[in-house]
């Protein structure tokens, strides 16, 4: 069974208010399901934007050193899981695996910059 992904809003995982999901498949084999994603409504999106605005002031007061630490943590996670992300890109987009690995590597480098 395909994994069902949720939205992350205001520090919590949540489904779409409609309860609906959208299924993503492999373009080369429509029977091969990648996962199910929340079919978010405009209200769901507006709630996420509102939550982001609510924490903007707190984030602004976060030191540049702490912000950099978050980016480095994200880079480390992405780098440690490069193969998983590259395989996902290859399955979903048909991208060559070497190209997908390179794309992940460039994302890691950007986060580390």
Which residues does each predicted region cover?
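Terminal low-complexity tails and localization/encapsulation signals of metabolic enzymes
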Residues: 1-36, 69, 73
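Glycine-rich loop-to-alpha-helix module at the N-terminal edge of alpha/beta enzyme cores
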Residues: 30-113
